UniProtKB/Swiss-Prot annotation:
GO biological process: chaperone cofactor-dependent protein refolding; endoplasmic reticulum unfolded protein response; ERAD pathway; protein refolding
Composition bias, Acidic residues: 665-676
Keyword terms, alphabetized: ATP-binding, Chaperone, Endoplasmic reticulum, Nucleotide-binding, Signal, Stress response
Family annotation (CDD domains): ASKHA_NBD_HSP70_BiP
Pfam families: HSP70
Keyword Membrane: no
Entry protein name: Heat shock 70 kDa protein BIP5
Compartment(s) where it occurs, according to its Swiss-Prot or TrEMBL record: Endoplasmic reticulum
Length: 676
C-alpha cells in the first residue's frame, strides 16, 4: 500500500523550492523546442553521466526519450580504466582494461574508491595492498604514481584519473551528437560525503565540463523506473549494488514527483569485493598445490583478477564454471572448478551485509515490508542470484522489478535530469519534481558540547533552516560557530566540518544577544552556514567545501552505528549537561537579582545568606565540572531551599513588584535560546 506523503509547512516550502529549481525558463524551452534535445538557451546539450567504479555510461534525452550512447567499440558501458603504454600512449576504457594483465603497474582503476578520501582512511590503506599500481600520500590525500612513458613518472590525483574517464564519456557524446559538449549531470553514490561530491565536481571541471548537478545514483535509477509511471503513489525501494559502491534508497513516486524518504549504503562494497574473495581463494589454492605465493606478482594477479571477474559473471547463469589461466606464472597453468555454491560461501558475509542498509533505510522511512510496492535492481552485481534471493526472502517472497537495465538505469535518470535542468521539457518530464535528502544530520555546538541539530538526516534538499541562539557569558562580543555532522547528541562524538567566528557583538548580559544561524544545503548537498547578530546586522558566512568535510564512509557508518549502540550513553550525557545548565542558570538569575532593585528590599541577614549560598554554588561548579546529573540536581535543590524562601518573602513584601523574580527564582524569558 502507498505511504501517505509527509505533509507539513516545511515540506510544502521544500516542494516549492524544488519546483522553482526545476521549472524551465522560457528561453530554455524555446531552445529545446528548436533543437529537440537537452539544450538550454546558449549552453548547448547537457548530458547525463554515470561515473562508476568499474564502468561508466553516458546518455542524452532527445526527441522524447533517453538515448544511451555507445562508445567507439560499440559498447554502451565503458570500463573506468586508464593506462599508459611504453610509448607514452594513454588508453581509456576497453583498451586500458584489455592490456592490464601485461601492464599492471601502469593501469589505473578504482579511482572512485580513492576520490575525496584521506590517505589515512582505513579503506584506502586496505585497497593500497590490493592495487597493482602505486598509491602515494600527497598533502594527506591518496594519489596515483605511474610511469606515463619511459623514465617519465607522474603523480595523478583521483580527480584527474576520474576526469580522464569523464573526458572519454564527453568525447563519446560529442561524436554521437556532432557538437561540442560542455555541461553534464554526474551521478554519485547516495552515501557519498561532501568531500567526495566536491571532488567529483572538480573532476568534471578538469574534464572540461560544467557539472550542473550532482545527483544520487539510486534516485537517478528511480527516475528511469518511474518516468512513464502514472497513477497512484508507489513506494519504491532501489537496491543499487555496483562494482564498488552500494546504496539503498526508498522513494515515494506519485505522478512525476520523486520524493526520497530515506537512504543508506556503503561506499566500499560491490563487485570488486566479490572478485577479491575469489582472488584470495585461488591464491590459497595455488600456494597449497604449487607452493608458490603470487601475492607479490602483479602480472599473475592481473591475469587471475580478469578470470575471477569472468567466472563471477558466468555463475549468474551457470551453476559451475572452470577458472583457467594459461601460464599464470613460470609456465604453470591454472585450471580449477568453481561452483556457484562455493562462490556464495566465499562471499556469504558480504552478501548478508547488503541487507543491513535495507533494514536501516526501512526503519528511517518508517515503512513496513508490506508498504514497498516495487523493488528496483540497479548495478551489475544485482545479477548475482544469491543477492536477489536474500532480497526476495527479506520481503516475503516479493519478486524484484526487472524492467530497467541495471547497467544503464543510472545514466538514463541522469540524462532525464540533465534535460530538465537545461530547460527542455515535454509531456514526460513537464511534471517531474525531484526531492532528494541529506544523508547525515547537520548541526552546531552549543554550551556544554551539546549538538543542536538544525537539519536532521533524511531531510529533503535543497533546504534551509534558521534558529536563534544567544551568548553564554556576560559582555561576550564574539561567538564561535562550530559546524558538525553526525547522529550523536554530543559534538565530541560527531565530525567537525568547519568553524568560524562572529565578532562585533554589542556587549550585553548573558542571554541578551540574539544570534541567528542559518544552515542551507543546496541541491548538490553542499552546506553553507550564515550567522548574524540581529541587533547590529553583522554577519559571517562559511561554505563547507571538500577540504572541510573530509569524512570517510567508515566514519559515517561508525557515527550511525554508535548512535544506535550508545543511545543510552547519549541520553545520560545530555541529561548531565541539562542538569548543569539548569544549576548555572539558577545561580546566574539569583546573582542578577542581588544586583537589582530587589536587593534593596532584602534585609541584611537575608542578603548575606543568599550571597553566601551563591558564592558556594559558584565554587562548587568550578570544582565539579564533570559531576553527575543527580549531583547537579541535588545542588540545585539545596540552593533553592536557601534562596526561594528569601525571594518569596521579599517578593511579597514588595507587593509582587519591584522587578523581582518569580517564586522559583527563574526569570521568565520568552526568548529562551540555546547558548553558544
Amino acid at each position: 500500500m502507498a505511504r501517505p506523503r509527509r505533509a507539513s509547512t516545511m515540506q510544502l516550502g521544500l516542494f516549492l523550492a524544488a519546483l522553482l529549481l526545476l521549472t524551465p525558463s522560457p528561453a530554455g524551452s524555446v531552445a529545446a523546442a528548436k533543437g529537440g534535445g537537452a539544450k538550454s538557451g546558449g549552453g548547448g546539450t547537457v548530458i547525463g553521466i554515470d561515473l562508476g567504479t568499474t564502468y561508466s555510461c553516458v546518455g542524452v534525452y532527445r526527441n522524447g526519450h533517453v538515448e544511451i550512447i555507445a562508445n567507439d567499440q560499440g559498447n554502451r558501458i565503458t570500463p573506468s580504466w586508464v593506462a599508459f603504454t611504453d610509448g607514452g600512449e594513454r588508453l581509456i576504457g576497453e583498451a586500458a582494461k584489455n592490456q592490464a594483465a601485461a601492464n599492471p603497474e601502469r593501469t589505473i582503476y578504482d579511482a572512485k574508491r580513492l576520490i575525496g578520501r584521506q590517505f589515512s582512511d582505513a579503506e584506502v590503506q586496505r585497497d593500497m595492498k590490493l592495487l597493482p599500481f602505486a598509491v602515494v600520500d600527497r598533502n594527506g590525500k591518496p594519489h596515483v604514481r605511474v610511469e606515463v612513458k619511459d623514465g617519465d613518472v607522474r603523480v595523478f590525483s583521483p580527480e584527474e584519473v576520474s576526469a580522464m574517464v569523464l573526458t572519454r564519456m564527453k568525447e563519446t557524446a560529442e561524436a554521437y551528437l556532432g557538437e561540442k559538449v560542455t555541461r553534464a549531470v554526474v551521478t554519485v553514490p547516495a552515501y557519498f560525503n561532501d568531500a567526495q561530491r566536491q571532488a567529483t565536481k572538480d573532476a568534471g571541471v578538469i574534464a572540461g565540463l560544467t557539472v550542473d548537478r550532482i545527483i544520487n545514483e539510486p534516485t537517478a535509477a528511480a527516475i528511469a523506473y518511474g518516468i512513464d509511471k502514472k497513477g497512484a503513489e508507489k513506494n519504491v525501494l532501489v537496491f543499487d549494488l555496483g562494482g564498488g559502491t552500494f546504496d539503498v534508497s526508498i522513494l515515494a513516486i506519485d505522478n512525476g514527483v520523486f520524493e526520497v524518504l530515506a537512504t543508506n549504503g556503503d561506499t566500499h562494497l560491490g563487485g570488486e569485493d566479490f572478485d577479491q574473495r575469489l582472488m584470495d581463494h585461488f591464491v590459497k589454492v595455488i600456494r597449497r598445490k604449487h607452493g608458490r605465493d603470487i601475492t607479490g606478482d602483479a602480472r599473475a594477479l592481473g591475469k587471475l583478477r580478469r578470470e575471477c571477474e569472468r567466472a563471477k559473471r558466468a555463475l549468474s547463469n551457470q551453476h559451475q564454471v572452470r577458472v583457467e589461466v594459461e601460464s599464470l606464472f613460470d609456465g604453470v597453468d591454472l585450471s580449477e572448478p568453481l561452483s556457484r555454491a562455493r562462490f556464495e560461501e566465499l562471499n556469504s558475509d558480504l552478501f548478508k551485509k547488503t541487507m543491513v542498509p535495507v533494514r536501516k533505510a526501512m526503519a528511517d522511512a518508517r515503512l513496513s515490508k508490506g508498504d514497498i510496492d516495487e523493488i528496483v535492481l540497479v548495478g551489475g552485481s544485482t545479477r548475482i542470484p544469491k543477492v536477489q534471493q536474500l532480497l526476495k526472502d527479506y520481503f516475503g517472497g516479493k519478486e524484484p522489478n526487472r524492467g530497467v537495465n541495471p547497467d544503464e538505469a543510472v545514466a538514463y535518470g541522469a540524462a532525464v535530469q540533465a534535460s530538465i535542468i537545461s530547460g527542455h521539457v515535454d509531456e514526460n518530464t513537464e511534471s517531474m519534481i525531484l526531492l532528494d535528502v541529506a544523508p547525515l544530520t547537520l548541526g552546531l555546538e552549543t554550551a556544554g558540547g551539546v549538538m543542536a541539530k538544525l537539519i536532521p538526516r533524511n531531510t529533503v534538499v535543497p533546504t534551509k533552516k534558521t534558529q536563534v541562539f544567544t551568548t553564554y557569558k556576560d559582555k561576550q562580543t564574539t561567538v564561535t560557530i562550530q559546524v558538525f555532522e553526525g547522529e550523536r547528541s554530543m559534538t565530541r562524538d560527531n565530525r567537525l566540518l568547519g568553524r568560524f567566528d562572529l565578532a562585533g557583538i554589542a556587549p550585553a548580559p548573558r542571554g541578551a544577544p540574539q544570534i541567528e544561524v542559518t544552515f542551507e544545503v543546496d541541491a548538490n548537498g553542499i552546506l553553507s552556514v550564515l550567522a548574524a547578530d540581529k541587533a547590529t546586522g553583522r554577519s559571517e558566512k562559511i561554505t563547507i567545501s571538500g577540504d572541510d568535510r573530509k569524512i570517510s564512509q567508515e566514519e559515517i557508518d561508525r557515527m550511525v552505528r554508535e548512535a544506535e549502540e550508545f543511545a543510552e550513553e547519549d541520553r545520560r550525557h545530555r541529561e548531565q549537561v541539562d542538569a548543569r545548565n539548569s544549576l548555572e542558570a539558577y545561580v546566574y538569575n539569583i546573582k542578577n537579582t542581588l544586583g537589582g532593585k530587589m536587593a534593596d528590599a532584602m534585609e541584611g541577614e537575608e542578603k548575606d545568606k543568599v550571597e553566601e549560598a551563591v558564592r558556594e554554588a559558584y565554587e562548587w561548579l568550578d570544582g565539579n565540572p564533570d559531576a553527575g546529573k543527580e549531583e547537579y540536581e541535588e545542588k540545585l535543590r539545596e540552593l533553592e531551599d536557601v534562596c526561594n524562601p528569601v525571594m518569596s518573602a521579599v517578593y511579597q513584601r514588595s507587593g509582587g513588584g519591584g522587578g523581582g523574580a518569580p517564586e522559583d527564582g527563574n526569570v521568565d524569558d520568552e526568548d529562551d535560546h540555546d547558548e553558544l
